[in-house]
Amino acid sequence: MMILCRLQGVSFVVAVVNYCWPSLPDSLTKDDFRKGLVKFGLWLLKHVPGLLYWWMTQKLFSSANAMEKNPVFFNDRDMEVLKRTPGFELLSENKLEQKSVFDNLRQDFMVGLGKWEFDPLTLKDPLPEDEGSVHLWAGFEDRVVPVELQRFVMEKLPWIKYHEIPHGGHLIVYDSEVCECILRALLLNEEPEAYIRATTELIVS
């Protein structure tokens, strides 16, 4: 409670949705190829992390890193970000050669996408009575975290202020205009009308 009293609010940007959450219906994820990738990745990280580390850093085969600059995961705007942002090193081969970086990412992945002991989709508003606000920002064309999952989270947790970037991908935080809107919404309580999705279509029958 002491920490909550000090918070102005919270902003989640392209937040990862865990396929293991009990409230997430199979009808929403059964055809999502990412679900299988996550399951396989968790198995590798748990049982043979050394093999995965070798594969991600080896030089024998090209494109060892499946995510780096891959249009399967990044839309056109994301690809432009990757081209013009020299410091962007998301899962890059050179960065992963540092074993400590790989180990930290491994722990993050296993905790974030492994089995949790609670269901976040049943949480109550931690900042009631206008004490603060919680925001969720999503890219309509996000190919890492599908927008349908973000919309479902919004439906289950209506106290979250949901913002959807029409042509945004997974790297919307690198868009200076969007980044400014995120900060203004959080710190000044300014609502960017262009990025507010007031209602959603029925996602799960």
Regions found by a protein language model. Give the residues of each.
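Alpha/beta-hydrolase
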Residues: 21, 26-123
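Short beta-strand/loop motif that positions the catalytic acidic residue
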Residues: 128-131, 135-138, 142
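Short, conserved loop/helix-junction motifs that constitute active-site signature segments
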Residues: 4-5, 125-131, 156-157
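The feature captures the conserved acid-bearing segment of alpha/beta-hydrolase catalytic domains
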Residues: 117-131, 147
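Catalytic active-site module of serine/aspartate enzymes centered on a nucleophile-bearing elbow/loop
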Residues: 151-205
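Hydrophobic/aromatic beta-strand patches that form the interior of the parallel beta-sheet core
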Residues: 11, 135-137, 163
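Conserved hydrolase catalytic core segment
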Residues: 1-26
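Conserved alpha/beta-hydrolase "acid-adjacent" motif
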Residues: 143-149
